[in-house]
């Protein structure tokens, strides 16, 4: 078969079966449920359950961002340097880390009785660093989508639904924690402490531990099942090269820089994400009611991703990403205005309107969650065409250099903005005597500003670099066909 016919066949043939597709998405969904459980609740656990002072919370966020980043530098070189065996390159890694990752997730919401002060701080930092390391290895489950099929349209379809599964899975812990909170109360917590001799510090702490345990069990089963059935079908060289050269190739790629700058700017929205649990507590009187904020946003996200998936048939990804940034700024500003009126008047109709606007805010996540993975997959092919190597782990790491800087700034500054002496927001921490303290109007409004307008500004700025991004349409297809030709020649040499 000629190279031309082989390339045409690869662009037309369907490789991924329905069973493989469904089980893979289930694995991704529950893997992201595990990461979402920690990402969405750990800050609230530190502040409301362990009662860390703001200085320790900021230091914790700084250390648990920087230390895993340094370790990840070596981990991604190991992953990209692995030879593709019979089981593939990424599948075995995802299967190996599923169980230890689940265990560390549970430990992220449990502190041994008697620990306090410096010893407690060292413990939670150690667990968080381990969690970060396992997440880097576990992210191999997402890399599998890039190599499941050489068919460009089928690859984009897999990436689209993988992103949808990730987004919905990331929101699932909110519902899980809520349901657990409805079942377990203060009496249950005291009973468990008495029977087991443990020291779970609050009902909220019990919610997190039980929720983490549920996520871990289901996560292990689905990740192992999904990774057992999927196949990696992309052919690429197994030649060993200096991994540092790969980083240089990525940095030299002009298309890569668009994504690097965009993700750098977008990660400042971590300040907004940090505020989510606390605005729920401030506005609704109970942090467990966070679902009233998160659920409309989550539904909007799922709908938004389906809408983006449909619009990709008529518009290119670049246009949709830029438009999404503009929409995000407008929707968040409108939500702030409605929220402000609600806080100052207490009108129940405005409360309903505000919830609707939370749904509208969620729509913009459709683009921000779905399209970056496609951009990265396209850029990886331009690098593969030049070098013959794939850098599925190294490229996200290079992107993370920028997000490390902006994310570290965001996670370090956010607690200082939120509470403590001299904070801008003035959030009052709960205590044993006052578990749900009343927050002032100024606190609620300022929290809302950082939760909405701050987020909209950063999403708008994240779209600006894509005004200069040209790897779309015909250019994207030409690169893909050239890569398929290169892979076919490589396969013939290896045969």
Regions found by a protein language model. Name each.
Residues 3-495:
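Membrane-embedded alpha-helical bundles of multi-pass transporters/translocases
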